[in-house]
Amino acid sequence: MKRKVYWKDLFASFTHSKGRFLSILTLMLLGSLALVGLKVTTPNMHRTANQFIQQQKMLDLAVMGDLGLDQADQEELLGVKGARVEFGLLLDLTVKGTGEAIRLFSPPKSLSSFRVTKGRLPKKEGELALASFWEDRYQIGDTLTLEEKAGTRSSLKRKQFTIVGFVQSSEMWSQKNLGTAMSGSGNLDAYALVSKEVFTTKLPAMARIQFDDLRSLDSFSQVYQKRLEAHQEELEKLLKDNGKARYQRLKQEADGQIQKGQKELSRAKGTLQSAKSQIDQDQQQLDLQEAQFKELAPFLPAKEQAASQEKIHQAKEQLDQKKKDWATGETELAKKEEELKKAQRERDQLEIPTYHVYDRKTMPGGQGYLMYSNASSSISAVGNIFPVVLYLVAAMVTFTTMTRFVDEERTNAGIFKALGYRTRDIILKFVLYGFFAGTIGTLLGTLLGHYFLSGIISNIITQGMVIGESREYFYGDMTLIALGLSFVASVLPAYWVSRKELKEEANLLLLPKPPVSGSKIFIERLHFIWKRLSFTHKVTARNLFRYKQRMLMTIFGVAGSVALLFAGLGIQSSVGGVSKRQFQEILSYELIVVKKTNASSRESKELTNRLEKSDIKDYRPIYSKVVEASLKGGRDKQTITMMVTDRTDFSPFVSLRSLKQGEPLSLKKGVIISSKLAQLARVTVGDRLTLDDHTFKVAGITENYVGHFIYMDQASYQKIYGKQTSANSYLLKLKNPSTQQVQTVSQDLMDLAAVKAVSQNASMISLFNSVAKSLDTTMMILVVVSILLAIVILYNLTNINVAERIRELSTIKVLGFHNKEVTLYIYRETILLSIIGILIGLGGGYYLHQFLIAMIAPDAILFYPKVGLGVFLFPVGGMLLLLILLGIYVDHYLRKVDMLEALKSVD
């Protein structure tokens, strides 16, 4: 049988129903755009990062010791099997005149190489290659003068350098948040490369390690992470006793030098004592000679008298010289004694050094890598949830659309069947319609997702990072998944509906589809209500339940759009609500000052005097330490800050309060942990938690959104650790908490000999802002997608409703109903169903929002669970506005319809 008429009819179905075709196409476009765009962003970022890591041969782990790495440490690390190990020097200084902190590195041989963006690497002692983000402040050939902290031993041969190039570090990805420093204000501002010959010490500060079995792995994969953790544990075990051994070596070396100094001092004292005795004897001899000369001088000839005087004069000069030499010796002896005492003090102040094994996220300057990893993980989590809901809504609407399409083509289907066409041929027409609409929309959405949406999201994340913009790749598997979902959402409904509707014989198909039979609804049984309803309201009530499929599709279509809109806006609200609560209400201090444990009483007094100055509003001495632990619910090792006070709380520096009720918590009851830590450790109040090789009972869980904290008083610490502790840090509140003032006070404190480090909240704020920025942009895009989805859904369902009931509308119009009444006759149903959908959508959106913020939050961040009033009002207002605009469109459309033509019989 020739199919010319068949194909002509198929083509006509495309051209005569452009709105329907475009609506299905748009739904599939939006679904595939969100799915592909969100799902390929993370792999694009990971592939770009992996290429950068491979090119720069970035380290896997770094080992740093409090006192550097001596020969024994180096030999032990070089013995690690299956690893390449390189040692490097680094030093924190300040830029003269600005007080900004800069970290000098010695050039690495091959691991974690620096990328030259302009100029060249330093070759001589007086040359320096500066961080590329300072290229707008300095030029090649400029001189940079650096300063070391006052009162410290000089670690550089020179302080003045000529800039010969600009570089980017493969370890410090962020160009804004470089972490903490031991100079300046406590925050690192820049870094540079200098020749290793510039350093006075040859003792390396760090070891860079790259493992053979990790080199070819995706650095963001679970396989890489598990192997890395295993290597990290091996290194930690290897270095476990190095601190004690190093302490013993240093102590023995110091004891040897002190003993040697004591011997030299004893010899010097003996020599000086002998010299003093000799001087005394010479003085007596001289006094005797002078006395004899005075007695005999009158009797001596002039010549002999002159000779005797000359002899006495020479003896006196010799004695004076001996006295001078003795005085010089006494001064030098006093210096030697002071040096010996200083050496003894340093020996007594020696502490067991700690060896730290860092990964790329936790190493100094690794904040950029951490931000990059967190942001990509959050985007991936959104991509696992958001498109699923979107496709589900799209599938429901497509089902309704195809049902209406089959009803419209019922007569044509009967004609084709009467002409001898098989049922499957007729069904194929609808399947092809859904296939082409879905496939074209999916392919367009896939291309936009691959090369537009993913680029926008990733470029926002990588702004200010040395890694540069993410490259865009095409993923065949994601395209196939999108096409598969399109098949399910657009082709299967077409097949299922057409198969169900076209089972009848040709003669029945040529007749109009029998109207849906009415039935008595529940509200009719409530006579006291039913009798008060007008005719049109009764019709509306009956029709709502008469067309159950359309009713459900409208409700759930609107509900799905509102839920997606609520979730997107809710995440923006949750992200925006964190910063103020965390850094103004919960952590209200500006600085943490870490004191040197070996500070002298004079140095400690200087620090106390500085803390008492008027620019510091209040301060609190505490004991603090950092603990690293692997938790059940965490992807990586978590960094936890422990704070111990001698009071019952940390007020007014830290607000300890419950997350839900906001009730104040007291340290009298025991240990209090932060909410995200409790979530990852999967503990509640009353449970026991093991950290830092010690187990304690959780007495309270405090509200906290960024970072992990453990709070306790002295009594709890002593009970857990079996020892008392003394304050080693200070929490500071400033009278003027402006950024400039925080920097000024930080620099003043860092200049004090008793201060080891100053920590600002800036690092935590930067960590949070990096995630917040990427999520905010992503949510903005998804909010736009949700709005477009709502427009398509309501427009589509409204058109279907009007088209299905045009004869009914024509009837009531010719009966004398006014235009407004005709419009409301049908549109009142849409309004009621949409309102129900909005209410359901708000409820569903709330739970979707709660689920999303739990899924997408990085390990160190908890998003604020509550949302602002605008999150409720915007979806409601937006949908109501859309209903009004569509109502105007429907009214305009119904005014132009030829009612008499619509009433003509199709029999």
Predicted feature locations:
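Membrane transport/envelope proteins' first extracytoplasmic loop
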Residues: 3-392, 578, 582-591, 702-785
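Juxtamembrane segments of multi-pass membrane proteins
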Residues: 535-668, 675-676
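Interfacial "coupling" helices/loops that link adjacent transmembrane helices in transporter permeases
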Residues: 9, 15-17, 396-435, 776, ...
